[in-house]
From Swiss-Prot:
ATP binds at residues 32-40, 55. CDD domains: STKc_PknB_like (cd14014). Belongs to the protein kinase superfamily. Ser/Thr protein kinase family. Pfam families: AAA_16, Pkinase. The gene is pknK. This is Serine/threonine-protein kinase PknK.
Amino acid sequence: MTDVDPHATRRDLVPNIPAELLEAGFDNVEEIGRGGFGVVYRCVQPSLDRAVAVKVLSTDLDRDNLERFLREQRAMGRLSGHPHIVTVLQVGVLAGGRPFIVMPYHAKNSLETLIRRHGPLDWRETLSIGVKLAGALEAAHRVGTLHRDVKPGNILLTDYGEPQLTDFGIARIAGGFETATGVIAGSPAFTAPEVLEGASPTPASDVYSLGATLFCVLTGHAAYERRSGERVIAQFLRITSQPIPDLRKQGLPADVAAAIERAMARHPADRPATAADVGEELRDVQRRNGVSVDEMPLPVELGVERRRSPEAHAAHRHTGGGTPTVPTPPTPATKYRPSVPTGSLVTRSRLTDILRAGGRRRLILIHAPSGFGKSTLAAQWREELSRDGAAVAWLTIDNDDNNEVWFLSHLLESIRRVRPTLAESLGHVLEEHGDDAGRYVLTSLIDEIHENDDRIAVVIDDWHRVSDSRTQAALGFLLDNGCHHLQLIVTSWSRAGLPVGRLRIGDELAEIDSAALRFDTDEAAALLNDAGGLRLPRADVQALTTSTDGWAAALRLAALSLRGGGDATQLLRGLSGASDVIHEFLSENVLDTLEPELREFLLVASVTERTCGGLASALAGITNGRAMLEEAEHRGLFLQRTEDDPNWFRFHQMFADFLHRRLERGGSHRVAELHRRASAWFAENGYLHEAVDHALAAGDPARAVDLVEQDETNLPEQSKMTTLLAIVQKLPTSMVVSRARLQLAIAWANILLQRPAPATGALNRFETALGRAELPEATQADLRAEADVLRAVAEVFADRVERVDDLLAEAMSRPDTLPPRVPGTAGNTAALAAICRFEFAEVYPLLDWAAPYQEMMGPFGTVYAQCLRGMAARNRLDIVAALQNFRTAFEVGTAVGAHSHAARLAGSLLAELLYETGDLAGAGRLMDESYLLGSEGGAVDYLAARYVIGARVKAAQGDHEGAADRLSTGGDTAVQLGLPRLAARINNERIRLGIALPAAVAADLLAPRTIPRDNGIATMTAELDEDSAVRLLSAGDSADRDQACQRAGALAAAIDGTRRPLAALQAQILHIETLAATGRESDARNELAPVATKCAELGLSRLLVDAGLA
């Protein structure tokens, strides 16, 4: 990173400052750094025996400035407890009049130093730093202090790698950069444009500086770094006039770049309103990208008494004239021991092995929703640790622990129960000093445990019951500052209220979540049969494990039901959240413990199989659905993010069943209304499948049919034909057959899937429905033009082109009056017909004409167009262009989905050319994937590549059985779809691979034939049969081989090499094969030489290998 603070270092400080520091009570004064605003010394404060950093400002201040400086630093002293603001230990003025600030000594130096030495940080670390610094700035702004100089050099790093902001307000006090408009307080590269232009600094300018700092952390340099030899004023002009460099070009997620761009917006009004808003935006980016979401510590309202529970408030008293204390209420002994028996538990060695591997990490966190066996596992681990000689305390959390003093008192009591002599006096300190004693008590506890050199573990059970921020901070302090003599084992519904991120970075966290806690089949058998006294066969145990998803509570409830005489078969069939025993458990232990607002939200959110913020808001009639979902997730309410998209959430199936049952109590009308809301939201957001499901669930099939018929996403254009047909299957048949548009959509899907019979049926029903529909004549004409395009597609897929031009004429004569898919498909269909007529040069203008309409379609039209360009180029022996076209088609198809219909379709043609150019491995991978399409997709050329070249690849790889299977399936497809040209390709390949043909088929192939020249498809079919005849004859006696050579020569001579270059080359190679077979070696060599040269130039190495000529 280049120098981000170009201000010249001031070196005019008087040399007696060390002496003045000694006079002020500091020892061992050592200069450790200089900056634009002063000199920093490392000193020792003998009175407290600690190392500190003392910054002495380089400017003498008048009375007003001095008072303002002291006032601002005292204000910051009120925030010294903020985890991301450097603590101000002392401020004052030296004998020589220079102000100084005393801070903790940071051995790890600054963020600027870290970047200089190790380079920029990745975007995940940068987001984390940004959230924390935003909280620090917000805290300062709330007490009326601006920073004025946020930059990497003013962000120090703690021993744990945490960022802390320092030097608040010093830039204003110590002077700055002078411009024509006055003095600029701060470093230019990180200063907001409006401040550079002379405006006063505001919280918005601090927001800009924070954004500029994050830009630097990501890139290793300032956005407007001062260039070599550049004058400061020129740098100012760039900052105030030029946009920031685009971070997306560095491969960063778009939302990361956008968040920083908003913070660095040119105009203050375009930036987030507050630093807290910046932090929340960065937290949202973390959530969207599936990374850990950092907390943004903000202070409670200063000067306002902390809210307490009524009981705590009543107990609040003053002792003497000093600090308020909160007496600890009477506590039952059961709070300090496990509530689960350990003798009859299922031994979960799989999990205790994980805990054992965690060693002495400071925190072992066991988190999952209710009923997953967290406390049971913690109790088992407590027993194991005790056997190993550790002292293990137990503390069960309850509502009383939402008071910091009470929690600390309970914590001390739990420890004294296993180590009576430990921390004997600390309880009295709490009683006497209350809230003010927390930090002292925790520090003393840590020191005493360390000095005793004794291993102590504390199980804190049900931590999720704590919501008080001071109690959470107390445990966080214990975890952050503890030593390896003390280990905390925490069970909770979630990670909330714990410094998980910091501990993970320091490798001080071992974690077991709900996925690990789920019982496997062996553990379930031990629970049900061994511990539960049942005798269930393994198949039933496995079925129960699957139906409960390994949820311990459900398995135990199932065991209780079976021991009570329940029917095992009935239980296995119907165990769900609607079961009485599970319903009762979830009611008592989960739902009924929630506040009414959250309980109601969970009920309505459960209507859909999955949900997100917008959907949940629509269902509940609120604006903060996302926040409510995250609250439910944090509280472990059986809600988790989906694996494929962290913006979506899904309830545990049993909890969803339970919520559905509770929701139904409100009546069917309410449930129907929620389904209608869900359908509307899904439709508006492009989720047709779910929109239809919920319209049907709402009892509104007419709306469901309307949604499919009016679908603007047009699923076939998205290569989602089977999805469309599956949706249609859900609709009432009587409604479907009467909708002309819907029948047309069904025809589209079936034709593209190479299903001629269902497609024809849909087109027939379309005509009937259109005749009965009361539609304007113009609309009917448009629909009929679209239907004719579909019929043309069906014709070319059936390997017929005679009627294609007539069927396309209407659509191609008025393309702009029709939906884009109609002319887009018409152009592709006309191009395919041109290929079948060997009019390769005509293909490109047709596709160029269709391209604007295809750009307005889904990707399927583009995939087909690129494939057709590739087919024309390959036939013309433009192999480079063909490869490029096929690759483009494959990439577009893969963007739809790696296993999409479009990707597999393009993959078959790309694989064919890869094989011909010698890439056997690449061809094999693509062919295997394409083969999964079967007969559903493409015209004969696609099917031939899939089956014929697919078989040839298998044979080349030594899998002759696989090759035979491919050809057998291809032969069946040719018969089923009535495709003589495909059948001819299959027969030809069987001969090539030495697979015997039926005698009658061989006899037909050997018979003399005249090759027609007026029909391209008939020509290609006859040429294939003639090629097959030549190969059959070449395998016979010498007379047959002579005849084969004559017929091969005639075949090659009849093909116009100018019009059909690829076909002519293939025919030449066949003729050379027969020359060699008849012993005419000299003739074969003479003909082979130019052919081999051409193949080498084109890269078609496999043509000669397969012919045995290479």
